[in-house]
Amino acid sequence: MAVKKRSIFEEVGQGAKAPVPQGGSIDRGQGGARRGIRLWLMALFVLVMAMIVVGGLTRLTDSGLSITEWRPVTGAVPPLNEAEWTAEFEKYRQSPQYRLMNAGMSMAEFQRIYWWEWGHRQLGRVIGLVWAVGFLGFLVARKMPRGWWPRLLALGVLGGIQGGIGWWMVASGLEGDRVAVESTRLAVHLSLAFIILGMIAWQALLLGRTEAELFQARRQREGRLYGMTTVLIVVAFLQVVLGALVAGIDAGRGFPTWPDMNGTFLPADMLYVPGVETDWRNPAWWLGLLQNPGFVQFLHRMAGYALVALGLVFWIFGRRTKHRATRGAFDLLALALLAQVALGVGTVLSAAEWQVAIAHQVGAVVIWVLILHARHLAHYPRVGSIRKGTL
């Protein structure tokens, strides 16, 4: 009986080949879903950013209270004839803003503010429609990457909540003798818009690379830079809230000087609340401070200084990374912060002229996204190559 010769290296040379690692579910993408979902998210990102800008213009033109009803579906159709315009104008005439601020307004003037508010709401409907069509389309076609439907569903849920908060905010300006919405409700509304925009941006960044690429990149995660961007996100979010409080009571127009505030560092009466005794233990006093122009404007300036100072310090650390893309992200962020300082000062000195004020708000959106971009690259660095010249 012949004896079969065996190689002493048989286990290594002739054994079963190890399976080749496969990409994750999002890599397979079920027919390119990853790319499609990313494009869909980018469309939503542009729409939400436009929504924030239009919302700012609606506020700056005092148009937000021109529509006194909340009709999510039927409100999509504007007045189409003279009778409908007259009926709509009559509803506005019952509002405190008309009686106390716009008495005698002409139909043409009313139509001008009406179209701003209608456009703002209509854009919200478009965002909801784009989200619903995209989400249901990917879901029904079974092209939704495994594990992604909850986070994409969350965008729609938050969008619906945002619509309700928008009406809750508007309703506050239709009561009593108010001629504007409550600044605290405006702050909630704007803050949620930034949260939604940030969620969309983060998911789109994740979809820019495969799961395998993200897994490899995560091995070189730069924890210190990631922690620094976390601090920046917290401070930037606080600054957004404070900016909304300033805008809600037009606090920027009362102190058109810089770096001082009408000749002093601490504005006069910044701790004064009408009708409430100054008492650190009194919640009414604390809430009243949010309606004090000097107090909220001072905090907004200080938070801005803190954000820029931290951003520039963290930029120094970001420049030390070996990853070129990460260095570039911190460079862009530092430049945006400096530009935002200039816009902020310009907004103050112009007493919040709408052109400068809206540019300042757009700057806040840009900074928010750039922080998220730097954070993403700190968590998932893009590995450079000497051969490709990307190191």
Curated annotation (Swiss-Prot):
Tell me where on the tree of life, at the top rank, the source sits: Bacteria
Residues where heme binds:
H300, H360
Q: Which GO terms describe its biological process?
A: heme A biosynthetic process
Q: Which InterPro entries match?
A: COX15/CtaA_fam, HemA_synt_rhodobact, HemeA_Synthase_type2
Q: What is its EC number?
A: 1.17.99.9
Keyword flag Oxidoreductase: yes
- Swiss-Prot/TrEMBL catalytic activity: Fe(II)-heme o + 2 A + H2O = Fe(II)-heme a + 2 AH2
- Its chief place of residence is membrane
Name its cellular compartments. Answer: Cell membrane
User: In what pathway does it function?
Assistant: Porphyrin-containing compound metabolism; heme A biosynthesis; heme A from heme O: step 1/1
Q: What GO molecular function annotations does the UniProt record carry, in alphabetical order?
A: metal ion binding; oxidoreductase activity, acting on NAD(P)H, heme protein as acceptor
Listed under subunit, the entry gives: Interacts with CtaB.
HAMAP family, per database record: HemeA_synth_type2
UniProt function note:
Catalyzes the conversion of heme O to heme A by two successive hydroxylations of the methyl group at C8. The first hydroxylation forms heme I, the second hydroxylation results in an unstable dihydroxymethyl group, which spontaneously dehydrates, resulting in the formyl group of heme A.
Record's family?
Belongs to the COX15/CtaA family. Type 2 subfamily.
Q: What is this protein called?
A: Heme A synthase
Whose protein is this, by species? Cereibacter sphaeroides (strain ATCC 17025 / ATH 2.4.3) (Rhodobacter sphaeroides)
Gene behind this chain?
ctaA
